[in-house]
Amino acid sequence: MEGLTKFLSTAPVLIMALLTVTAGILIEFNRFYPDLLFHPLG
């Protein structure tokens, strides 16, 4: 059991969880406001 807790506290797992949460937030934001993420240069 302590091997599982040691695995869950490693950096790659935390980075993947953070990236998953960030991607989910961006996807939901882009679904409700699709034109705010990509501004035209003109």
From Swiss-Prot:
It comes from the Bacteria. One of its GO terms (biological process) is photosynthesis. It is a single-pass membrane protein. It holds the Pfam family PSI_PsaJ. The chain crosses the membrane at residues 7-27. SUPFAM superfamilies: Subunit IX of photosystem I reaction centre, PsaJ (SSF81544). Keywords: Membrane, Photosynthesis, Photosystem I, Thylakoid, Transmembrane, Transmembrane helix. InterPro entries: PSI_PsaJ, PSI_PsaJ_sf. One of its GO terms (cellular component) is photosystem I. It is found in: Cellular thylakoid membrane. May help in the organization of the PsaE and PsaF subunits. Belongs to the PsaJ family. This is Photosystem I reaction center subunit IX.
